[in-house]
Amino acid sequence: MPAVYGARLTTFEDSEKESEYGYVRKVSGPVVVADGMAGAAMYELVRVGRDNLIGEIIRLEGDSATIQVYEETAGLMVNDPVLRTHKPLSVELGPGILGNIFDGIQRPLKTIAKRSGDVYIPRGVSVPALDKDTLWEFQPKKIGEGDLLTGGDLYATVFENTLMQHHIALPPDAMGKITYIAPPGQYSITDTVLELEFQGVKKKFTMLQTWPVRTPRPVASKLAADTPLLTGQRVLDALFPSVLGGTCAIPGAFGCGKTVISQALSKYSNSDAVVYVGCGERGNEMAEVLMDFPQLTMTLPDGREESVMKRTTLVANTSNMPVAAREASIYTGITLAEYFRDMGYNVSMMADSTSRWAEALREISGRLAEMPADSGYPAYLAARLASFYERPGKVKCLGGPERTGSVTIVGAVSPPGGDFSDPVTSATLSIVQVFWGLDKKLAQRKHFPSVNWLISYSKYSTALESFYEQFDPDFINIRTKAREVLQREDDLNEIVQLVGKDALAEGDKITLETAKLLREDYLAQNAFTPYDKFCPFYKSVWMMRNIIHFYNLANQAVERGAGSDGQKITYSLIKHRVGDLFYRLVSQKFEDPAEGEAALVGQFQKLHEDLSTGFRNLEDETR
């Protein structure tokens, strides 16, 4: 090997001199087989060829290693060198993650664009994930020299932006007695801010730590989740709730609105931080997120308006990027989410879409000549999905002070043709606890969010009962009644198609009208209007209460109006006499949350009382 070439190889960011090289024996798309790799480890990071392409070892046989390369492999030749790094694929964790956009292996795309001046990522580019030159305001906790620290202890705070405080924790595997802690001031992430001594050995720590992406970060214990993930979407919050620390799947055909729901969750949910992973989806969708999010603001409890981007991290791995990196992007995203969870934050991770990730697994599996299972996917597809979906949850964090955090995963699934029997969808549904099934027919009718209320479900309803009891003791009964009305409407639709609506009993006509109210004016929501883009939970509860109140009063009036001399109160009479109240029920969604909770609740209460009065007068008149 020429000396010049050897010198060039060691200039990438790992400054340690490497002594062991393998050489390329075979190239098949993103899969490379290298010989002379004795002593290499599974999932070890390697640099392949003259361009130092990033790769990861996924199979070992004797001294040959099979490597999946995360960049375009065109131009690789037999006998090209393969450089080992003796470490797994890891991410850098520290101040500077929020507001940034990375690719699937945590390379900062903004920095690469500035340095290369190109719209595409150059091959073999090596840029630190986090900026090493930026100075951060470091504020140590009330600890000093001689104090003991153990893994997970928070020892300082960095003011990352005006929205988020970044707590600096000791890496989980470290412990010892403090021999030095930096005074308050400005430091970069590579400056030493802490020194510990353990069994006579001193070790220095910076604000930067690395963590292998395939290894879950340790926690003290897992806890039962009991706080709802409030999304601002009525159909999700009221009928199919998730929890902070839950797992949700959004399967749906193309054009059903999966990405819009994912983005709405990122914008308006009650999470402290959001990791949005665009995995194998169109580049325009990530561009849309990059354009929209910086302009979106959220109102804090103290009245301040802050940009949503200040709590968001984007991992973009679009469909025109190398296939292998899709697999890494999901693990990169969940590791970043776990890092913020360990600070005591509630984090949401949006994976859009896990189907593309599974397709990447299928392609790599095919290149490895593994035995295919259903639809050509590998037999271990369900195991890989399960290992990803078991990483979220509500946890008690390691170290002190005592704190809890959570990671919630919302995974969009894109089954071909909207077929829910697809292997990825089937495997996902057997794992997740919340299923928000999107319906192509609803989307074609322009009913958004197009969540089908007949096939969707949530297994967290029981876990959240204590929260609902405190918030509003009537809510559980109201929700049960609303579900019954929607289910009854589905049963009646077949009869209506056969004999027509006029042949139905008066009570059934009321059921159909109430179900229409629920469908068109409660479950449907316009994400592009100021009054309906986000619906607070109190507004969702009051809207449903008034609709079900109308249903109960109308049924009661019909029953009381039925006598031996015929039906005095009919559905058409109700519609005629209380038409103005009916219009006010339809118009509830136009109430703007910006007016404040007290004003809105007052208006909803007045409508509730007016409904009772209107039906009482109707019954009195017809006696």
From Swiss-Prot:
Keywords from the named record: ATP-binding, Hydrogen ion transport, Ion transport, Nucleotide-binding, Translocase, Transport
Gene Ontology, cellular component aspect: plant-type vacuole; proton-transporting V-type ATPase, V1 domain
Function text: Catalytic subunit of the peripheral V1 complex of vacuolar ATPase. V-ATPase vacuolar ATPase is responsible for acidifying a variety of intracellular compartments in eukaryotic cells.
Reaction(s) this enzyme catalyzes, per UniProt: ATP + H2O + 4 H(+)(in) = ADP + phosphate + 5 H(+)(out)
Protein name according to UniProt: V-type proton ATPase catalytic subunit A
GO biological process per UniProt: ATP metabolic process
KW Repeat (keyword) present: no
GO MF annotation terms: ATP binding; ATP hydrolysis activity; proton-transporting ATPase activity, rotational mechanism
Gene3D superfamilies linked: 2.40.30.20, 2.40.50.100, Bovine Mitochondrial F1-atpase, Atp Synthase Beta Chain, Chain D, domain 3, P-loop containing nucleotide triphosphate hydrolases
Top-level taxon of the source organism: Eukaryota
EC number(s) reported in the record: 7.1.2.2
Family statement: Belongs to the ATPase alpha/beta chains family.
Subunit architecture: V-ATPase is a heteromultimeric enzyme composed of a peripheral catalytic V1 complex (main components: subunits A, B, C, D, E, and F) attached to an integral membrane V0 proton pore complex (main component: the proteolipid protein).
Record keyword ATP-binding present: yes
PANTHER family: H(+)-TRANSPORTING TWO-SECTOR ATPASE, V-TYPE PROTON ATPASE CATALYTIC SUBUNIT A
Chain sites annotated for binding ATP: G252, A253, F254, G255, C256, G257, K258, T259
Organism: Vigna radiata var. radiata
HAMAP family listed in its UniProt record: ATP_synth_A_arch
